[in-house]
């Protein structure tokens, strides 16, 4: 059973799990501590003798503007320490997998030739997964390198000739010859594979690594400090090796500065050549060069350019100058290109650790990069960032440290990335770079063309840091300029009316003599884009009836001298004046659902309101006229209300009166008798006034006391004789009526005719069946059944049982 299961495994994992697998088909690497001893396996660089010339050094001085193109960000060179503790289970698991998949490192002979090293460079299985990728990219790299270097050197030659004065002809010829030799050497040595020094860590001697890395910038005032003057502690062979490398880097600097303006920043440079010269930085305590030497090298670019050609060994052209030259060139391109690398916000830069040294490595592409690595480090140098990002963007392999393979890192660069949207990183220079075959190729090409044209314009005008105005700003400036010109032209004519200045914005009778006011009107006219406005007239006509045309008054009305429509009446004293909103009978209808008369489709016809009579009571009940009373007919203003008392009471009477009910002619089942009866309440004759006596006045008078007492007694008698009717009201309220209470209440409290008519016609209305009536009858019937059948018997049994117990 177990054998059947193992057959389904992939061939790669099965081979890795077997003991006899020796890694012959895999030239992988690992960043374990076992690779620390590979520092001594670096081959000896060849040397070519080139005659030194002091005259050339004295006469040649590069343009200071070119020297300042060097990246200032390279001063902040400090690499994060790669020795991190593994705190995550996932990290340790993936590290073990990386160790299992890593083959044993092959020994490389120090005395081996570059051709031998090139043969051992890419040993990948011809039937493996990565065979197709390696073969295709190997051919593409060789072709692209040849074309790129040739175009770069030709541009370099043209630029050198244009920028050098006639007085410096000798220095121009020397620099041009150096550039041509570099180009020929690079084309010849192309098959040779250079060990990726930028990804290795030299554990043997820290001071040697530091001297090589900073040899191109260690300068005293107008003097180059060679590598021999540094306190080197290693072997003599290694000192000689690194001294040659430093001289080669210095030599390539002149060509890099001269071709900065001519080479297209979008040119693809394979990472195998572009990023080979870089030495990982060690701790700050082991630095052999001070920060002062770094600043000196930036402040004296002339000395660097002049003495490079003096100390440049002849043997350094065949191998290393092209790589370092392209690497520095690419780092300078990042300063002026806004869209060089899309992967600055997409992928993450591999941290250059100490333990990732291996002379022979498996070529990796963007599809075969299976290792994790740390995200961008704020301490890493800008030049290393540019190199690493370019390697990823151009589809080349990048050496990543297994120590940086962390799941806990917020920024990752691997095929196992969960999402690319969570990486919110922007390069310190704002550079973006994408592949030429990617989705964003067309957009990036357009951006680069615009950026190149802008940069060329700025260089011609000798203006630094000046950006072109946006389209909106330019349009605004042009509009403002036109407005100011037009306003100044208009202000020169003081006799012009405001109508001539701004058509339709002001009356023609007003003269605009103020200049600023003209400008304001002109501005409004110029920038008015004609905003959309709703057709309020048509919108209103669809819902509300239009008012009467004064020119065509309705029949029976005429227009008076004030422009108001009034009725035509011979009797001028009784004229009823109405305002202009008076409508005829047909126009006074409220059309709640307007219908188009032109279309005689019966299906589109809607409900139309009947003729509406507007008076004091109905005007507030008509819809849509409450909020828009202007279209309603006007009410009369001079009508005299006549209060004529009549004995007749109409059906719409709203005054409460005591009237008799008119019972229908037929038999009535009601018990009430609606015959007129006399009022049973005794009428109390009330005196008109209540007896009154001013006691204060009486007591304060000068009359005799006998007269005062007599008046008081008379007042007392008058009060006794005064009857307020309270006793009669109390007796009527407390008396017992011979009739039933219902009849008594009905007779005493009936107030109007419609109440009595309702009671009289109740028997007829009760015969009409309705849902509510049926429900009420059923409920009443159920109640009768329940109480008659059950409750009555139970109540009898209850009382009988209680009586028995008693």
UniProtKB/Swiss-Prot annotation:
UniProt source species: Kluyveromyces lactis (strain ATCC 8585 / CBS 2359 / DSM 70799 / NBRC 1267 / NRRL Y-1140 / WM37) (Yeast)
Compositional bias annotation for Polar residues: 38-63, 71-85, 315-329, 458-500
Start-end of Basic and acidic residues biased regions: 280-312
Record function comment: Involved in the resistance to unfolded protein response (UPR)-inducing agents.
Skewed-composition ranges (Acidic residues): 418-432
Superkingdom per UniProt: Eukaryota
Name the UniProt record assigns to this protein: Protein FYV8
Family statement: Belongs to the FYV8 family.
Region spans: Disordered: 1-88, 101-124, 248-389, 409-517
